[in-house]
Amino acid sequence: MTQISERLLVQAHLDAKQPKPLTAEEEAYYRSAIAAELKAQDAVLVAHFYCDPIIQALAEETGGCVSDSLEMARFGNAHPAKTVVVAGVKFMGETAKILNPEKRVLMPTLEATCSLDLGCPVDEFSAFCDQHPERTVVVYANTSAAVKARADWVVTSSCALEIVESLKDNGETIIWGPDKHLGTYIQRQTGADMLLWDGACIVHEEFKSKQLEDMKALYPDAAILVHPESPTSVIELADAVGSTSQLIAAAQSLPNKTLIVATDRGIFYKMQQLCPDKVFIEAPTAGNGAACRSCAHCPWMAMNTLERTLKCLKEGSNEIFVDPALIPQAIRPLKRMLDFTQAARMKLAGNA
């Protein structure tokens, strides 16, 4: 299976570095200019929870969306804007284009990728699937359009458990890709028969149970929130496990005033916004400074800046294109996910 080279990771950090922080005047200029361009071009900005707070705030201010990847896909699909600007990583832009082939999809940069996407080349993954033709292929949203086209289902961390549980109840066996930690978590929770691809998120894989136990000893009254892309030993220490949106909901509902959070620190913007009376602490990674690869923030998410956002709008640059031959195959598993989650929402509303 493909391994992500340290060179790629180091380069991502270098690319993500900001030349210098913006002054208050510069920030105000970019925010105003971007808002004007969005309005003039009938465009909407959607941003992931892991983007820098300034990008998330701008999406909210301009009538866009800040959410997890499932809601980003749903919002972009339902919004009437002719142009969707996706602040996130490349697979999110591709997903928006697959679901809305008639729309123009722009990104602040096309260099913002994902270690899960990079670690699951379509030729290798397809060969793996071909060895087990009897199995249903379920892939995480953090994959290329080509890998999605090879799948039967696409899932996000907010709906993966329910979808796999449903497939298991139907007697289906599963190939899962690419995140091995999320796959292991789902396998343990559902008891499903799953073959796992060997991929990992560079942010979540760095959280370590020993350091987390030490931190819990320092904050004994704190609750621990963990994203399921983390290693099993970290998940086992959690008071709540879930997707970004589920962790935000847990932060609101748990009585604890201090929360240790094992996911990308970009999520703190929304948590602090919704829970201003609570204290949020980053879970420790394997190292600090130069010793850690991600240091609890995705280097590719950090590439989404105000400067790049304005530039892509003014120039029409960094447009996402997906091979038209792939779209019919890739949209099928995505629509299955959206239909499944919509049906689950309606059922929940009916039971309320």
Curated annotation (Swiss-Prot):
Gene3D superfamilies: NadA-like (3.40.50.10800). Its cofactor is [4Fe-4S] cluster. GO terms for molecular function: 4 iron, 4 sulfur cluster binding; metal ion binding; quinolinate synthetase A activity. It catalyses: iminosuccinate + dihydroxyacetone phosphate = quinolinate + phosphate + 2 H2O + H(+). Pathway: Cofactor biosynthesis; NAD(+) biosynthesis; quinolinate from iminoaspartate: step 1/1. One of its GO terms (biological process) is 'de novo' NAD biosynthetic process from L-aspartate. One of its GO terms (cellular component) is cytosol. [4Fe-4S] cluster binds at residues 114, 201, 298. Binds 1 [4Fe-4S] cluster per subunit. Keywords: 4Fe-4S, Cytoplasm, Iron, Iron-sulfur, Metal-binding, Pyridine nucleotide biosynthesis, Transferase. It comes from the Bacteria. The keyword Ribosomal protein does not apply. Its EC number is 2.5.1.72. InterPro entries: NadA (IPR003473), NadA_sf (IPR036094), Quinolinate_synth_A_type1 (IPR023513). Belongs to the quinolinate synthase family. Type 1 subfamily. Catalyzes the condensation of iminoaspartate with dihydroxyacetone phosphate to form quinolinate. This is Quinolinate synthase. It comes from Pseudomonas fluorescens (strain Pf0-1).
